[in-house]
Amino acid sequence: MPRPTVEELRLTSFKSYRRAVLPLAPLTVLHGPAGVGKSNALDALAVLSRLALGEEIAGSLDGLPERTGPLAGPVRGGLAGCVPHGRDAIILGCTVRSPHGLIRLDAVIRTDGPVRIARESLTLDGRTLMDTGEQDVRNRRVNVCWHNDTRQGDIRAPFPSGTMITAQLPLRVAGSSAGECLVLAASEDLLTALREVFPLHPVPALMRGWARADPQARLRSNAANISAVVARLSNECQRRYGQLLRAVQAVAPHPLLGLALAERETAGVQRVLAVFDEGVLGRTGADQASDGMLRHLAFAAVLLTGAGVLDLDVATEVPWAHRQLTVLAEDLGAGLSVEQAAALLRLAREMAERSQLRVVAALQEPAAAREALAGASGGGAVLVECRRDPDSGFTVLRPQVPRVPVQGGRGEAAGAGAGGRSAGGGSSAGTRAVPAGGSSAVGGAVPAGGAAGAGGAVLAGGAAGAGGAGGAAGRDAVDLEG
């Protein structure tokens, strides 16, 4: 059974984005200089993931210090930082591919007055399963209508507007009819896909400290407790520990014999520190290691271990085989050479091809991605250029096709090139900005069904499936932007 996965992110009004669409493949790499908005796209998916946990919107985005887990700290910039300058609304959406079909979520969050859901809709293959109506701003309620295929028709009821409506459906819909069961199945698939999102932005300054030993240590988003996680892996799974060691050895600029641990006791608390064993050169602890090696260690650990050792609030009621982890790798190439960053991306591609996880990575220079993704086919990877429109200042996304190395002689290559242009209706090297309508074109039209064309078109992940990105819900959302 296919696992629910996010295949498209719609950034209608969020930070530096206006009416932008990001197609998501098993491995998606965004590149561009600092300040163009790569991190903003990762933040958008992180925001949807937080809202899917069912907590109040303001607390979900500003952080809940009394909590542990992904909501303990704020999303970058907090709630106020997510609202575009001069606006009073966040408008986001996504499309999830599930065993039941393409599920489309669109949400408008207003921040003028009480933070609230102003509009939210959920559709499955174009059929509306849930939609919102009139608001009672003073009492923070919104009328919700959901699908029901009995004689009494669709059901309406007021819901609290301070929380994502879709996250409330499993607690409010009885499931007493086939229609309601479909609503529950679609909402649970969407929530499962969003809750399995893990933002990873390693901070080397925090990773150098001694970590409290914990046999159940879960890596935090800043990787501050990486030493405790390495200790857990060394005791729990020698196979993964060995894979992690080989991944680190592959990029080390000097012979590396092992990945060890130093231990000490402070005030009755056992603490550990990851150590790079360099043989005759000595042992370098995490407190002395370079920023790049520490960041590489954190990224490799996440790619090789999966959700079981991450600080996630996963849908434990859903069997592991029906869940799919998505890693948001922030600034993946920082402190690494092109070859080292390419090695990480090759590892990410390998794990994505095995359906172990999905990765959305951001880096500045595309050289490492082009090297790692050379020969990628079948829609397994998408390279997306991020830039700022010089007139509006908004971020523009330009998906690109990973280039496949030419096989055979020049004559064969020329013939293949001519054939590709004829079949695709244009040069396969061309790129265009992704329009708000949800379909992108790279050397030709992109199929909405999510299958790669023979000409190598970028996958749109079924963007136009559930009513199209320019549907009524999207238009109403823009009208509510204010």
Language-model features: locations:
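N-terminal pre-Walker A segment at the start of P-loop NTPase domains
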Residues: 1-16
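Hydrophobic positions in the central parallel beta-sheet of the AAA+
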Residues: 9, 325-328
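Phosphate-binding P-loop
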Residues: 19-25, 319-321
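Phosphate-binding glycine-rich loops of NTP-binding sites
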Residues: 26-69, 223-224, 291-306, 347
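Conserved P-loop NTP-binding catalytic core
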Residues: 43-114
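Electropositive, glycine-dotted interaction segments
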Residues: 104-242, 246
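Conserved ABC ATPase signature
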Residues: 242, 249-253, 257-321, 331-339
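C-terminal lobe/lid and adjacent interdomain/linker elements of RecA-like ASCE P-loop ATPase modules
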Residues: 342-438, 460-462, 467-482
